[in-house]
């Protein structure tokens, strides 16, 4: 009963340090989901206004929102993964770069949750291609969230 009324552990877990690869993966996944939800749904509420609830119930519109949601989400996961590993490599001297593994784990999980095969494959191929050419020591300083920002358009 106490945990229900005062979910302290649930709240404080959000502020604990990242101590494992799994913690890092959860951080990237949760932050990317948060960014996607606040930007996409905030934008829609602003543009649609009072008709927001009605539009969400429209089947075609809901399908379009779902496609946009997945595109923005995988882009946010990609940008955040690159940012995190770039920062850790440059500032914290991280030696083992598991960016690709973390990214693929997340999108493979999301594929099971409804991410379309097309978006999954495109995101995977783009990430792998970009990872080959990235300057890991500078990426976090050079407009690291450009792609996910552009995914809104």
Report each predicted region and the residues it spans.
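Short runs of predominantly hydrophobic/aromatic residues within well-ordered alpha helices
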Residues: 29, 33-37, 69, 73-77, ...
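Short acidic alpha-helical/loop segments enriched in Asp/Glu that coordinate divalent cations
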Residues: 53-56, 89-103, 117-123
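N-terminal interaction modules that seed assembly of large macromolecular complexes
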Residues: 42-94
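Eukaryote-specific, cytoplasm-facing alpha-helical/coiled-coil scaffolding segments in long proteins
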Residues: 63-68, 101-116
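Helix-driven interaction modules
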Residues: 109-153
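Leu/Val/Ala/Ile-rich N-terminal alpha-helices, chiefly Sec-type signal peptides and the beginnings
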Residues: 1-60, 67
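Basic/polar, acidic-poor N-terminal "presequence/leader" segments
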Residues: 1-6, 97-101, 105-109
């Amino acid at each position: 009963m106490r945990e229900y009324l005062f979910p302290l552990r649930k709240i404080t877990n959000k502020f604990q340090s990242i101590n494992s690869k799994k913690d890092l993966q959860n951080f990237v996944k949760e932050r990317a989901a948060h960014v996607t939800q606040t930007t996409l749904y905030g934008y829609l509420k602003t543009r649609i206004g009072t008709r927001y609830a009605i539009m969400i119930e429209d089947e075609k519109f809901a399908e379009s929102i779902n496609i946009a949601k997945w595109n923005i989400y995988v882009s946010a996961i990609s940008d955040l993964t690159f940012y995190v590993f770039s920062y850790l490599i440059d500032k914290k001297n991280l030696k083992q770069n598991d960016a690709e593994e973390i990214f693929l784990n997340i999108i493979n999980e999301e594929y099971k949750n409804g991410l379309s095969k097309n978006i999954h494959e495109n995101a995977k191929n783009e990430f792998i291609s970009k990872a080959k050419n990235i300057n890991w020591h500078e990426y976090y300083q050079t407009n690291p969230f450009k792609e996910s920002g552009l995914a809104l358009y």
